[in-house]
From Swiss-Prot:
SUPFAM superfamilies, per database record: 1-deoxy-D-xylulose-5-phosphate reductoisomerase, C-terminal domain (SSF69055), Glyceraldehyde-3-phosphate dehydrogenase-like, C-terminal domain (SSF55347), NAD(P)-binding Rossmann-fold domains (SSF51735)
Binding annotation for NADPH: 11-14, 39, 117, 119, 199
Catalytic activity, as annotated: 2-C-methyl-D-erythritol 4-phosphate + NADP(+) = 1-deoxy-D-xylulose 5-phosphate + NADPH + H(+)
EC number per UniProt: 1.1.1.267
Pfam families for the chain: DXP_redisom_C, DXP_reductoisom, DXPR_C
Residues at which Mn(2+) binds: 143, 145, 215
Protein name: 1-deoxy-D-xylulose 5-phosphate reductoisomerase
Gene name of the record: dxr
Record-listed 1-deoxy-D-xylulose 5-phosphate binding positions: 118, 144-145, 170, 193, 206, 211-212, 215
The keyword Hydrolase is annotated on this UniProt entry: no
Source superkingdom: Bacteria
Keywords on record: Isoprene biosynthesis, Manganese, Metal-binding, NADP, Oxidoreductase
Amino acid sequence: MRLGVSLLGSTGSIGRQTLEVVAAHPDRFRVVALAARSQIDALQEQVRIFRPELVAIAQESLGISFPDTRVVSGPGGLVEAATYETADIVVIALSGNSGIEPTLAAAAAGKTIALANKESVVCAGPLLRDIQSRTGCQVRPVDSEHSALWQLLQLPHRPAEIARVILTASGGPFRDRPLEHLNQVTPDEALAHPTWRMGPKITIDSATLLNKGLELIEAHWLFDLPFERLDVVIHPQSIVHALLAFVDGTTVAHAAYPDMRLPIQYALFYPERVASTVPPLDLARIGPLEFFPPDTERFPALPLAREVGIAGSTYPTVLCAADEIAVEAFLAGQIRFTEIVPLIRSVLDRHQPASEPLTLEAILAADRWARSVARELVGRAIRHA
């Protein structure tokens, strides 16, 4: 039987690679819904090839581009695609906070979710966990590090036997650049990630290491891991993706070439493993593997994200929203690379968190507030430049 796949964020980097995996296994999967916010030409080509039953787009006026397919639009369209009746697996590959509501809707509908949207867990982790406990939905992480950790945690063990959980980070393109030169970094330089092929937002987050900080928060909620057991190491080769250290001194590692098709395929096929077009790992050809502690002076976003994760409430939402605005401003040449994290911290310092318990409405309100404040701070930076 072929499983129906609903793919949200189909024209982005993860979305395109998901369709590569699906296309390689036409006997196992069929695309029943596609959703995208932009790149309509690319979406039209995807619709022509995969012939989904439903297409969700940002603007209703663009529906004329798909005359032979049922079209829905706006945030409600994303939710409809995420809960589509014939979808067995919902792949959430949206970038940013737009992924939160459809992820929660898919979970409430009891769908199996292949999740590549960090914000759904970082901002709404408590809500997602609560819905999972009620519906029994399965969330399969697509991020390479969390996929690796998910696989490691399936090894026989008792929770008390875990001493440390370690996520790796490449260190991005500036891990060796002199600190005094970081304020001269250009957007093109920051977008040149040494190992991964990703979209622009996550590539900049990888350069600041905020991405890894968000992954610490994500690991906390996905796997119920306390922050004091979560660590990060710099691993420039991006071959080892996660490590599990046990109390007896043993450490097990997950290693693979840095290719997103591997975690995508694992999430789609789980618990089955099938042959991949990615070559098997050849450690002899790779040569030395290096590991270093992160330099928090170079990467202040990492301890900031940990601090935010521990604080909880709507602080993670403010972190993510302010980061989106700061990254947009950097890519537009409005602020320096070294101003990204200070701008985010300034927004966090102004935030008054929502009262408990956390709600979707509080998350969305905090998101709007943080974006407004971040834009105001960007405007001030431009005026004083």
